[in-house]
Amino acid sequence: MASEDLREYLEAARQRRVHEQDARKQEMAARHEARRRDFDARSEPLNVHVVRVLEGARADLAEAGAKLEYKFHSYNAGKQLENPRVEFQIAGVGSPGTASSVYVIEIVQDGQVVVRTKRSFGDPDTTLTPHGSAPRTAASLKDVGLTDVIKAAIDEYVQHGG
């Protein structure tokens, strides 16, 4: 009888452990999904408008002998990016050494847009420096906000001999 009670106790303990693990997995999955939905919702201004404007600027700059490269970052839990962002840089077609900084446009939690710069695409976020631009919101990207940032990148590119 004692061995049967022990067996039942062990089985009940195993079942509790399995249920606790399942509950933790479901909680983590729900948190992950909520973060992904929030990230996607805040990405909307970048997805639709910014990429269209950058593509237009890319075509215009190609006619002028320069190239615009950009990288749009989508949600990836492994990268630990909290905010949607797009990075772009303007460089010469023939001389890649002449280039602007990499401009990083990021939409933070409260809908504010933060513009920062770093030297190259591979540089870590610890090297980001604030860009001296006016405070923006995601909605202002659809007006002249993004164009101003692209113009600043073009000005920097020209100053570096582009």
At which residue positions do the language-model features occur?
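Contiguous, amphipathic alpha-helical segments that mediate oligomerization or scaffolding
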Residues: 17-68
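Intrinsically disordered, low-complexity regulatory segments enriched in Ser/Thr/Pro
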Residues: 1, 80-144
